[in-house]
Swiss-Prot record:
HAMAP family in the record: CitD (MF_00805)
Organism encoding this protein: Streptococcus pyogenes serotype M18 (strain MGAS8232)
Pfam families: ACP
Record's protein name: Citrate lyase acyl carrier protein
Secretion signal, residue range per the UniProt entry: none
Subunit structure and binding partners: Oligomer with a subunit composition of (alpha,beta,gamma)6.
Gene, per the UniProt record: citD
């Protein structure tokens, strides 16, 4: 999926994550994370965001995530929503997304 514009999903409420996805001219994926549980779960959160981007076939993006204790399913859902908004895609391939949970 080609990231065309900056988009945001989520909130700064407790148990949520606000994620911002922007185009990256360097043709790489960069993830910046701000989390109160970064020492415990930072690597896992980054890996989950990165894997979700790979599953969505994103090859270049700047991602900024502010975590407030979100569960994995919330992190994945917010990432999916932000990527679709940033790519200008309004149709979700639910069958493909469901296949990730095998």
């Amino acid at each position: 999926m080609d990231i065309k514009q900056t988009a945001v999903a989520g909130s700064l409420e407790s148990s949520d994550l606000m994620i911002t996805v922007s185009p990256n001219d360097e043709q790489t994926i960069t993830i910046t994370l701000d989390s109160s549980v970064e020492k415990q779960f930072g690597n896992h959160i980054r890996q989950l965001i990165h894997q979700t981007l790979v599953n969505l076939k994103v090859t270049a993006a700047k991602v900024e995530a502010v975590d407030k204790g979100a569960l994995d399913c919330t992190i994945q859902a917010r990432t999916i929503a932000a990527v679709h908004r940033a790519a200008g895609v309004d149709q979700y391939d639910w069958k493909e997304i469901d296949s990730w949970n095998v």
